[in-house]
Structure formats: structure tokens, C-alpha cells
Regions:
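Feature activates predominantly on carbohydrate-active enzymes
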Residues: 2-3, 11-22, 26-28, 74-151
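Compositionally biased regions
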Residues: 6, 10, 40-41
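A sequence-composition feature that detects small, non-aromatic residues
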Residues: 12, 19-20, 33, 47-50, ...
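Long, low-hydrophobicity ectodomains and other hydrophilic envelope-associated domains
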Residues: 22-26, 30, 34-37, 61
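Surface-exposed patches in mature extracellular/periplasmic domains of secreted proteins
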Residues: 33-41, 125-126
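Short, well-ordered secondary-structure micro-motifs within conserved domains or adaptor modules
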Residues: 37-73
């Protein structure tokens, strides 16, 4: 799937907004173009390649996916600061969901995606951001909880 937009709720917490802006910033560095950040209420129902970021309690699209059991319920399946990264087809449209049990988990999920899928290197003296032609994401189904809180 190719990422085309990032969707976060107007009622998102500061950490959820930080997660969305962080992903947007790195996407700009990868491809040299802006990926739009769209309110979950303004995201068109026919938006293919949307990244849905946030908690089920703040993002109605993620809540609907949890209720329809298209993605796991983070409150039941994760420890604090844990995250779920899931690609899926919903109504014929590709979506990438990054959610967590709490806002810190959403941010952890974004950083996991950046490191493990997009190859960003975070080092004491800086970071390494690979250049890409497009933002293609493979099929993913990741659920992770840290062994210790406050990663």
C-alpha cells in the first residue's frame, strides 16, 4: 500500500498529534513531498492509502474498526505504552492503523514503523533518513508491548 494521507482526530491528545506530525515530518524527509495531515472527520470515505493514527476513544475510524473486529482492541490486548500497527482493506480501500492502549503507545508505534519498516536510524549524534521514491508499506500485523514502561 502507498501512503497518501495521515488522519488524526480533532480530539486527539498532544502525544497522538505529536505521533501524526512526526510521521508527516519523516514522510516529507523520505520523499521530499508533503503527505497531508487530515482530521478524521474530514477524511473522505474513499481515501485509499490513509494512515489512521490514535486511540479508539479519540479516533472514530479506529473505534469503528475495533468494534467491527477488523483490528484488535488495544485496551484488551496490550500493556501500557504498547501499540498495534496493522494494514487492512476496508471497503476495498487500503488503510494503515497505528493505535495503542494509551497515547504513548501510539507514539511508540510511529517510531517502530520509522525504524523497522522505513529504515530510519536514530543515533546519539543524529539520525539517518533514507530517501525513497514512494511510501510503500508492506502487509503488517504488529502488536508490541514494552517489557518496561517509559521507553
Amino acid at each position: 500500500m502507498i501512503l497518501n494521507s495521515i488522519s488524526v482526530s480533532d480530539s486527539a491528545s498532544e502525544l497522538e498529534m505529536l505521533a501524526a506530525r512526526t510521521l508527516q515530518d519523516y514522510c516529507r524527509q523520505f520523499i521530499g513531498a508533503e503527505i497531508p495531515l487530515i482530521s478524521s472527520h474530514d477524511l473522505e470515505t474513499d481515501a485509499d492509502g490513509a494512515v489512521l493514527i490514535g486511540l479508539p476513544s479519540t479516533n472514530p475510524q479506529i473505534d469503528a474498526l475495533v468494534r467491527s473486529r477488523k483490528i484488535r482492541n488495544p485496551e484488551r490486548s496490550l500493556k501500557p505504552e504498547g501499540f498495534i500497527i496493522e494494514t487492512l482493506i476496508d471497503g476495498g480501500l487500503s488503510k494503515l492503523v497505528i493505535t495503542g492502549r494509551e497515547p504513548k503507545g501510539v507514539l511508540n508505534g510511529v517510531y517502530h514503523l520509522l525504524r523497522e519498516i522505513f529504515g530510519v536510524g536514530f543515533f546519539g549524534d543524529g539520525r539517518q533518513v533514507p530517501k525513497r521514491d514512494s511510501l510503500t508499506v508492506p502487509e503488517l500485523s504488529i502488536a508490541s508491548s514494552p517489557k518496561f514502561n517509559n521507553q
